[in-house]
């Protein structure tokens, strides 16, 4: 069993996809962002995605280990831009505005 198989089994237990269908846009976006961040980095235990709301917009802050920041951001910010687009799409289903930032 590979590391990814073990992680997939653990992640499947933590978030039931059926629960996401009824979740609010912000919760769905947070779950999707957490999943994507964990798939991109080596130190999955260091990933923590926190949400805060201000003026009708939810900001998701991704905390990662310093050695994984480059993987999470990508060249010219392309990876984090893709994560932002997916998170925004997940939130848009319920009309929620989502912003994704990376903690340094």
What is each of the regions a protein language model found here?
Residues 73-77:
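Glycine-centered tight-turn and secondary-structure capping sites
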Residues 1-69, 82-104:
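RNA-contacting regions in translation and RNA-metabolism proteins
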């Amino acid at each position: 069993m590979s590391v990814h198989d073990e992680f997939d089994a653990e992640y499947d237990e933590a978030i039931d996809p059926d629960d996401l269908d009824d979740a609010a846009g912000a919760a769905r976006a947070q779950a999707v962002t957490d999943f994507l961040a964990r798939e991109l980095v080596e130190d999955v235990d260091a990933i923590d995605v926190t949400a805060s709301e201000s003026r009708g917009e939810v900001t998701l802050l991704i905390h990662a280990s310093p050695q994984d920041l480059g993987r999470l951001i990508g060249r010219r910010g392309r990876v984090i831009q893709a994560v932002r687009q997916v998170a925004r799409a997940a939130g848009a289903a319920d009309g929620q505005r989502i912003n994704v930032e990376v903690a340094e």
